[in-house]
A protein has these predicted regions:
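Core AdoMet radical
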Residues: 6-20, 28-45, 55-73, 86-111, ...
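Distinct, well-ordered alpha-helical segments
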Residues: 43-52, 72-82, 135-138
């Protein structure tokens, strides 16, 4: 995505990064949210296998992942690896405003509606407070997310190495 530079710190050995984090999962609440700033289908095989093992050993009943919209037809097959847990997915749409999604290079066609996204995903991630953003757009996206999704997050843009700039007025 245009606003993202997270890919610059990826590890050549992701399981070595992920394993110590996953070893901390207790299962106390029966829910696990795997946040990786990417798509679950792109996790390495060792990490996926460890998550599946944790689901069974720790009695996880609900498992959340993030996935790009392009994986929408693979969600069911991927979910089967984690039975008996209910697997839910969120999509980083960032905005329901097609012009903004295109400018951010989200790879989600401008004709894709919130209803279409909700056919596949139970949650969405929204992004706000970039230069050119507006309070009205943010509130509209929140209202759409409330109507169509069981879960949504509103993420405030943080300065990074990309050309996208933060709107400090909106932040405050």
């Amino acid at each position: 995505c245009t606003f993202c530079d997270y890919h610059t710190d990826t590890s050549l050995q992701p399981f070595e990064v992920n394993r110590p984090v996953l070893e901390q999962v207790t299962g106390r609440y029966g829910m696990l949210d795997v946040i990786n700033s990417g798509s679950a289908m792109e996790l390495d095989e060792d990490t996926v296998a460890m998550i599946a093992d944790i689901v069974r050993k720790k009695a996880i009943h609900t498992l959340w992942f993030e996935a790009h919209y392009m994986y929408r037809n693979r969600l069911s097959d991927f979910s089967a690896r984690f039975e008996p847990a209910v697997v839910k997915f969120r999509c980083g749409v960032e905005s329901f405003e097609p012009t903004l999604r295109n400018r951010w290079n989200k790879g989600i066609s401008s004709d894709v509606t919130p209803q279409e996204i909700a056919r596949y995903f139970q949650g969405v991630c929204l992004l706000c407070c970039t230069e050119g953003d507006s309070r009205e757009r943010i509130l509209n996206d929140i209202e759409i997310a409330r109507r169509h999704f069981e879960y949504f997050s509103v993420n405030v843009f943080c300065r990074n190495t990309t050309f996208v700039r933060r709107d400090e007025t909106l932040v405050h």
